[in-house]
């Protein structure tokens, strides 16, 4: 089995990695406020936008706007259950802070 690792660190502190490009493992996107998982297929189909752009962070945000991406985000609440599922859609919130916001529907969020 070929074992390789992809790690991209963006200027705003967001990192993108995958344990193995040869398997069905999912990409993991980390920012200061969230951890996102999505399939390699959905990312690689538009990866050329990242490679060909001098401003990789902006290109990645454009990619996220174009694609519906499944992800997992950690959260907890003292008043509610520690774990719940919510359907959301990812939207980059701030390039400066590396934060991500969620909007609409399409992604499972779980504690």
From Swiss-Prot:
* Keyword Glycoprotein tagged: yes
One GO CC term, this protein: extracellular region
Entry-listed glycosylation sites:
52
Top-level taxon of origin: Eukaryota
Cellular localization per UniProt: Secreted; Host nucleus; Host cytoplasm
Transmembrane segment boundaries: none
Signal peptide feature range:
1-16
Span list, region Disordered:
73-92
Segments carrying motif RxLR-dEER: 88-91
Q: Which UniProt keywords apply?
A: Glycoprotein, Host cytoplasm, Host nucleus, Secreted, Signal, Virulence
* Entry domain remark: Has the canonical translocation RxLR motif, but lacks the canonical EER motif, which characterizes most oomycete effectors identified so far.
* Recorded family membership: Belongs to the RxLR effector family.
User: What biological function has been recorded for the protein in this entry?
Assistant: Secreted effector that partially suppresses the host cell death induced by cell death-inducing proteins.
Q: What is this protein called?
A: Secreted RxLR effector protein 81
Lineage of the source organism? Eukaryota, Sar, Stramenopiles, Oomycota, Peronosporales
